[in-house]
C-alpha cells in the first residue's frame, strides 16, 4: 500500500515528507495506457500533488496543472486531504529516451509553460497560484512554486522508475522544508546534506526506499516520525455526476444524441471509466427537464 510518512527533526528546524507512490502511478499508467515519458511526467505530477495535499487541512481539494507548450500537452491532477489523487495527461503516447542509456526524458521536451495550483478550501474562494516552469522536470518546478508562492524554502525529489517493459517499477519522492526558528548553522548543515544526497533515482531503487530516503535526509540527526498515512489513486466520478452534466445540455442536443447516435458514451478524463446512456436514459433526462 502506498503511504506518506511525515517527520520532523528533533531540533524542530526541519520537517520531511517521504512517499511511496508506486501503486498510485502504476494504476494511473494502467488506466491511461501511457507510454514511458508520459508515464513519468504524469507520475511526477501525481506525487507532487500528494505532497501538496498532505500540507492542507479539512476537506480542501488541490488541483495541480503542468501546462507546457510541448508534445505532452497539459497534465492535470486533483487531490484531497485524505490521500486520494487522480489525474491525466493530454498526450499519453510520448516515449522519448536517451539512445545511449535508455533514460526516460521529460524536462527537455516539456517546453515553456507554467506550474499552476488551485486550492479549494470549500469556501467558494479558491486560491490560485501560477509560477513558471523552471526545468520542466516537475520536481524542480514544484520546489520553485513552494519557495515563490508559499514563501517556504523547500527541497523536492520525486521520480518514477520503469522496468524493462516500461511498466512502473517504483515511484515516490520527498519534501524537506525549513521551519521557522531554524538557525543559519542548521540550515547550512541540511543544505550540505541535501547536496550530498544520492540521486532520487538511486534512492528509489533501494530495497526499502522509504527508509533510504529518511536516512539520506536526516543522516545521524535524531528525528521523530509524526504520522504514516495511506495514499491511493482514486477517482470520484460517478454515473450520477455525468447524468447531472447531461441535464445541463439543451433538449435539442440530447435529442440529437438519440437520433444520430442512439445514445451517448461519456468517458471520465481522470480514470477512463466509460458511462453508457441509451435512448431511454436520454429520453428520461429530457422528460425531467420538461
From Swiss-Prot:
Keywords: Chaperone, Cytoplasm, Disulfide bond, Redox-active center, Zinc. Disulfide bonds join 235-237, 268-271. Under oxidizing conditions two disulfide bonds are formed involving the reactive cysteines. Under reducing conditions zinc is bound to the reactive cysteines and the protein is inactive. It is found in: Cytoplasm. InterPro entries: Heat_shock_Hsp33, Heat_shock_Hsp33_C, Heat_shock_Hsp33_N. One of its GO terms (molecular function) is unfolded protein binding. Belongs to the HSP33 family. This is 33 kDa chaperonin. It comes from Streptococcus pyogenes serotype M1.
